[in-house]
Amino acid sequence: MKSIFLSLSLLASATVGVLAAEELGIDVTVPVECDRKTRKGDKINVHYRGTLQSNGQQFDASYDRGTPFSFKLGGGQVIKGWDEGLVDMCIGEKRTLTVPPSYGYGQRSIGPIPAGSTLIFETELIGIDGVPKPESIVYKQAAEKAEEAASAVEEKVAEATDKAGGKIADATKKVEEKAEEASANVVEKVASVVSGAAEAVKTVVADTDDVQEHNEL
């Protein structure tokens, strides 16, 4: 019974591995911000470079020809991996597609591509027919870095402000303490002077009384 469960477990693991290997991989290598993304039915212009996952050998590249490839997205004019992997893409965006046989050429041998091959496509969306090209391409990474930099500056300013506020508070407290100390010293000195003056007056009065008593005698 244990061996049966073990066999079933291994079979399930192998099935999961096969299903994972058959999934279309979409890696956005250069993300871009835009309002109008590709959708099925668009005629798009794409630059690409295709290689075999097994050995990295290049089998085709529009970059080498200097002309992007044009086709109707979702119209079945290209392999399934492209029809599904290039949807919701911005002009200027780059993606790397990992295309398993079920999304590529299956078990057919096509030119330099052996049967059952997993293909790697480096793609770049050059344009969408009928959609004006943006005057400038806003790269997400640059925007995110700018936001991070601005956030970091704000944090530094807040930190510096807190430190400065603390130092000012400390300095104010020290000034107040010194002022209180100086005031106390002044009061003490004034009291001492007043006390001395009072003693002097007492002495003068006492001397005057002595003189009067002597004259009366």
From Swiss-Prot:
Q: What class of enzyme is it?
A: isomerase
Q: Which Pfam families match?
A: FKBP_C
Q: List the disulfide bonds.
A: none
Keyword Zinc present in the record's keywords: the answer is no
Keywords, in A-Z order: Endoplasmic reticulum, Isomerase, Rotamase, Signal
- Per the record, GO CC terms? endoplasmic reticulum; endoplasmic reticulum lumen
- One GO MF term attached to the UniProt entry: peptidyl-prolyl cis-trans isomerase activity
E.C. numbers: 5.2.1.8
The subcellular localization recorded is:
Endoplasmic reticulum lumen
Tell me the ranges covered by the PPIase FKBP-type domain, including all copies: 41-129
Major localisation = endoplasmic reticulum
This molecule's function is given as: PPIases accelerate the folding of proteins. It catalyzes the cis-trans isomerization of proline imidic peptide bonds in oligopeptides.
> Which family does the UniProt entry place this protein in?
Belongs to the FKBP-type PPIase family.
Give the protein name, as stated in the record: FK506-binding protein 2
Organism whose genome encodes this protein: Neurospora crassa (strain ATCC 24698 / 74-OR23-1A / CBS 708.71 / DSM 1257 / FGSC 987)
Name of the gene encoding the protein in the UniProt record: fkr-5
